[in-house]
């Protein structure tokens, strides 16, 4: 199974989820300065323009190689890149893992909730996905709130599941199924 970029791009009047552009480099640079984003994603911790552009190209490649889809979370009015939402295929057929981040200047406005709701509903209703899941550290209360506010169901606690810089961490599992959509 592969995913193609939604056409037209997904929007709810607050955010637009679109393909990464080379002009989004400032967003990648700001994300690289946040210690938590590079720790849990592929955003380069040591930012250079070349590394930032290579990261954007790798995001394009996710769709091309069937790995999943990486979308920019952008302001609907200005088109300014504010973060990312990613859905990646997992071993179980029809299952994707969702991940997301916002640069610090974009936090506190529920933009992640808008993005997660848009892409999860698109995946379940239009892209043939059967299950969207997320793994969140117990300490990441903000991310748990994003998932819960968008209808994800908390399923359980996995001990020593996540790996960050060779350190293991617990994870809370969330999922959203087509039957959860209202």
Show the residue positions of the predicted features:
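Hydrophobic residues in alpha-helical segments
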Residues: 32, 41, 63-64
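Conserved GNAT-fold acetyl-CoA-binding loop/helix
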Residues: 36-58, 69-71
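Acyl-donor (CoA/ACP) binding surface of acyl/acetyltransferases
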Residues: 1-35, 70, 74-182
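A generic membrane alpha-helix/interface feature
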Residues: 51-54, 66, 101, 169
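A generic secondary-structure signal
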Residues: 58-62, 122
């Amino acid at each position: 199974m592969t995913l193609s970029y939604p056409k037209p791009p997904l929007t709810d009047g607050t955010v637009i989820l679109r393909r990464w552009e080379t002009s989004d480099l400032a967003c990648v640079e700001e994300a690289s300065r946040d210690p938590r984003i590079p720790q849990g994603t592929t955003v380069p911790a040591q930012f250079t323009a070349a590394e930032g552009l290579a990261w954007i190209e790798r995001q394009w490649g996710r769709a091309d190689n069937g790995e999943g889809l990486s979308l920019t979370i952008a302001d609907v009015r200005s088109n300014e890149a504010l973060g990312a939402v990613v859905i990646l295929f997992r071993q179980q057929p029809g299952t994707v893992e969702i991940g997301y981040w916002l640069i610090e200047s974009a936090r506190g406005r529920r933009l992640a909730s808008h993005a997660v709701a848009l892409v999860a509903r698109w995946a379940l209703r239009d892209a043939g996905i059967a299950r969207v899941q997320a793994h969140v550290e117990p300490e990441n209360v903000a991310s748990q709130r994003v998932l819960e506010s968008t209808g994800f169901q908390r399923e359980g606690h996995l001990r020593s599941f996540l790996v960050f810089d060779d350190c293991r961490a617990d994870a809370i599992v969330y999922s959203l199924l087509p039957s959860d959509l209202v």
